[in-house]
Amino acid sequence: YSGGNPWGGISADIDREILYVSTGNAGFFFDGVNRPGKNKYSNSIIAIDIKNKKLLWEFQEIEHDIWDYDIAAPPILTSITVNNNKKVDVVVGVTKTGNTLVLDRLTGNNIYGYIKKKVPLSKTPGEKVSFYQKKFILPEPFAKQVFNKNDITNISEKSHKYISNKIKNKS
């Protein structure tokens, strides 16, 4: 089993000598029975002091990933204006879940905040998923985050029935 590797890419703030890395999920992502806990540093954006070779901070989007939600895009370095016209240098990460992480480059704090949302437990014997995952309010997700029966394909009756049966048998 592995931890979060540099999966999505790397960006560097040359002036501050900070490296930003988006990480993958802990292997094997579909089975977390033998890797208990949050699997720190996986599914994260981390900041590393290049000169001193030290971790400055990490921000984990998904804890104990069993859904293949690694951060597959490289971090984007930019600046935004927030409260009272204050300019903040940020690192932005777009994720497979449709979230856009906007983090302070120096602290790793999420600029817009989040809430912790209770999530369903796994039905896999021995699997201990995190009880809560982060739910980001802003920026609004750029992709749909919930799938229900109304979303099943209607391209053909055969396809619709096939997917409906698959979902029914998983419940």
Predicted features, each with a name:
Residues 1-171:
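Beta-sheet-rich non-transmembrane sensory/scaffold domains
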